Amino acid sequence: MAARRPGLIALFDVDGTLTAPRKVVTPEMLTFMQELRKVVTVGVVGGSDLIKISEQLGSTVTNDYDYVFSENGLVAHKEGKLIGTQSLKSFLGEEKLKEFINFTLHYIADLDIPIKRGTFIEFRSGMLNVSPIGRNCSQEERDEFEKYDKVHNIRPKMVSVLREKFAHLNLTFSIGGQISFDVFPQGWDKTYCLRYLDGFNEIHFFGDKTYKGGNDHEIYESERTVGHTVTSPDDTVKQCKSLFLEN
């Protein structure tokens, strides 16, 4: 068996990269990741919290990968152990947080879209996730909203309003997944996790939303990473085989 390549890590987005959006990882992908882990250090970085990442990648996720960065790395695990956390509440303060949440809920209340469900704002330790349709919609409703959003630009328009209204808070708005966007302080995008990877001189990042405004863009563009755009989990496997397993 080939020895692990020192100083190199392969870092993966979750949705659209290791799994279909919000779907559970396939057994084939899990097996492939374990094979890959024999030759390179492997990490995952997702915008979701650890509970959601575990639902997609499995309950043993923090042990299946060398590094697991949930909420863009604001909650960081290495070899199964928690190594760092950051809190939006302590960073912004309750008053500013409340001002933002109140305005956003008013905006959604006035929004004319075909359907609305529930959980329009999800508070995570390092970010807010905002969904105009509501996070507890069905998968079918998710798919429908995604199509509707592509035509009517519900999320981009909402982000534009919030960005202007709350310019003084220096927030980043990142559209990801099918139905929502993340809101967090500038610099708390996926590049945040790189502070834990100083021991690596070659960081390969794989993600699907690497375009400007996508939640993989900043880490993809970072001078510290070699960025790879993927179109699906199958494409991720194909690119990794070519890069790490066939030479």
Curated annotation (Swiss-Prot):
The active site is at D13, D15. Pathway: Nucleotide-sugar biosynthesis; GDP-alpha-D-mannose biosynthesis; alpha-D-mannose 1-phosphate from D-fructose 6-phosphate: step 2/2. Its EC number is 5.4.2.8. One of its GO terms (biological process) is mannose metabolic process. Its cofactor is Mg(2+). GO terms for cellular component: cytosol. One of its GO terms (molecular function) is metal ion binding. It comes from the Eukaryota. Pfam families: PMM (PF03332). Mg(2+) 1 binds at D13, D15, D208. Keywords: Cytoplasm, Isomerase, Magnesium, Metal-binding. This is Phosphomannomutase. It comes from Glycine max (Soybean).
